[in-house]
Amino acid sequence: MDKLFTGKFLFTGLVFAGLALYPFIGSSYGLDLVSKIMIYAILAMSLELLVGSTGLVCFGQAAFFGIGAYIAVLFSPESESANLLWLLPASILAAAVYALFVGALSLRTKGVYFIMVTLAFAQMAYYVVHDTKLGGGTDGIYLYFKPILGSVLDLNNPKTLYFFTWVFLVWTFVFLAMLLRSHFGRVLAGIRINEQRMRASGFSTYPYKLAAFTTSGGIAGLAGFLFAVKDGFVNPEMMSWHLSGALLIMIILGGLGHLRGAIIGAFAFVFLQEFFKSSAIFGEFAKHWQLGLGFTIIACVALLPKGLVGLPEVLRKRLDGSRPRDAQVVLK
């Protein structure tokens, strides 16, 4: 078990190291793409805390993401750069407060009712920015000046913004990994496995679920802030149910119950999107990239029930099964 645990974190450490080295060898397009994927990975980990770790299938994660992004733009002056030290916490806090409100009501329901309530609250937030001038309507709004931290941190530099995002990706992973290995995380695992048994053991599960929901919303707000700063633009589609659905696909594709699965799923999902959108590879079929992406995801889920994190185990079993029985006896 210790070797397995060490191996998992060694793999994750190598991935983080590779991402840290990428700006020195990657193109400007690649830098922008990987920055976007890292933001989606942070967002996917926030949902993994709910779905994979607590057993709460939330269909409104995009709302918290969008709130973090809109706060970053709406609270930024049009004539100068905002101070990063207060704008970033404001985005996280706004998303967390809305998550606290949504969670306080939705967590009193279960199953499909919980899914529908979270979706309803997400759509409410979507239409607030879609149908009013507050969020620029369907046109969205621009971030004219990216936030700064004096002369120390200039996020207008693509490499600086990349490393800024990378730091928060690593921080999110470490924070959630420590959280899930704490007493709080063990209670969440117990709720996922059998909530009634946890209640019978004397645990009041509602506060734990609400704390997890609020934490998840705050991290989603962090991802939204990073996305707004990277693109310099936000629109209502950031809050649409399509993004919430895509996030669920990411964590299922990567492997539920694993933080590294959320990261792997985010990378796999976006790379598959870019692959099937390539007209240089697929020609006219690239216009129908959703078909290729859909069939590939279905195949991955069918062949890899544990997600992409389970791929090494599947390959190991197939290799062991393909060896002659006599050879296996000799190896033993």
Please tell me what each predicted stretch does.
Residues 1-332:
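Transmembrane alpha-helices and adjacent helix-loop boundaries
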